[in-house]
Amino acid sequence: MILNVEVGFDDLNTTYQLRSQQPHDGQVQQQGSRNIPQLSLPMSPVARPIQRTTQILSHLQHTMSAHHPIPAAPWRSAFLSHVDKMESPTFMLSTLHHRGSSVTPRSRTVVYRGAWAEIPVNPKNQAPLNPSLYESDLLTITTDARMEKVPELSTDGEDIPQSGGGGPVEAVFWVVETKTQWRLRGRAYLLGQDIDDPSASHVRQEIEKHMRLKNNDDSGSWNWGKEITAHFGNLSPGMRGSFRNPPPGTKRDEKPAPGLGLGQKVEDLDDEIARRNFRVVVIVPEEVDQVDLSDPEDGRRWNYQLKDGSWEKTELWP
């Protein structure tokens, strides 16, 4: 018996096909306009074609989530407007630190680097940019892969060699200009140099759910690796050089490895050492709390929760 399955659809400006020509070939071949993960379907000689169909449909359901993204969050416009007013867009990022069987909170100040897929314009950035095709409700920061917070972004406290994560985080902004506090709780994902590889497909899929086409225009070509390089290029040479620092948290009297040292400036956007340590962190909010204290006699508070693919808004007492 021969099972033929053919599917065509657009996924982030990608059209590709799935075909099974033989019932026991063990793999679905993929063809497309960009590198996409291979779908391996190991089957025993007695496996029935319906099992193959079930696996293919499961894969399609996961991939098609990017074609039907989650609608824009009702808090998005106000949040972006408030952050734009900040003299320095910093916030507190809280994570969970695992040590043996104990879990303790960790917090640090980080710099907001814009919404994912909407990198802020920097005329000094020499990196090639993706076309402005998408918008999202996702926050971005940059970090060093050697930082202690990297394993804290995983679900189990284990280190993340490249792309991965999904651990719980909370981001807290105090916007003094509007006297508003924003707390965003959700999951954080680390994006490394392997982001276009099949091994990082689960990270891309989680983020793609929140990427919405602007004006239904998918005529351009958008690339994940290019977006990460653009974030690296948006940093100053001195900030890029910080990714050639000695390993954070190591003893000062330990001699750093060749090429590492403080105070370096990096002009080359493909600097091997700096890029090896550079990561983009994408925060996917699942709950947002907004407290407006601009009127001391009538404070306002709203809670937003992402449930079943849509946002629910509730007004609360502050």
Descriptions of predicted regions:
Residues 44-318:
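Binding-site signature for planar aromatic cofactors or substrates
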Residues 1-42:
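Intrinsically disordered, low-complexity basic segments at termini and long loops, enriched
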